[in-house]
Amino acid sequence: MNFKYIVAVSFLITSGYARSVKNDEQSLSQRDVLEEESLREIRGIGGALLSAGKAALKGLAKGFAEHFGKRTAEDHEVMKRLEAVMRDLDSLDHPEEASERETRGFNQEEIANLFTKKEKRILGPVLSLVGSALGGLIKKIG
């Protein structure tokens, strides 16, 4: 009788532990899915902000070009830099196409780190270039 009781209790403990492990695995996979969804949302918001900023810069550059008509060599250089910045921003809108060759063998975490590094590497100079270009144009207006 004691042996049957010990076997039954052992079986109950084992099945309870197995259910616990299974629930832990499910909660971890659900947490991973939620983290991935939140990262997509954050990148989507960032992409929308970049698109809006890009459209504003294009409109501003076009407005300045129409307003001032002829450009000096310095203005021409600034506009060329702004156009290069716009191309860089376009590549950020479609990171899968732009960095597809670079990221073929990497895992997801390395891809996310690479994308973040590219954003930082491009956005820093872009913001300083845009700031200096706008500052120069505002000085000429004023």
UniProtKB/Swiss-Prot annotation:
It comes from the Eukaryota. Residues 19-43, 72-121 form a propeptide. Residues 1-18 form the signal peptide. The keyword Plastid does not apply. Its main location: secreted. Expressed by the skin glands. One of its GO terms (biological process) is killing of cells of another organism. InterPro entries: Bombinin. The modification Phenylalanine amide is found at F68. The modification Isoleucine amide is found at I141. GO terms for cellular component: extracellular region. It is found in: Secreted. Keywords: Amidation, Amphibian defense peptide, Antibiotic, Antimicrobial, Cleavage on pair of basic residues, Cytolysis, Fungicide, Hemolysis, Secreted, Signal. Pfam families: Bombinin. Maximin-y shows antimicrobial activity against bacteria and against the fungus C.albicans. It has little hemolytic activity. Belongs to the bombinin family. This is Maximins y/Hv type 2. It comes from Bombina maxima (Giant fire-bellied toad).
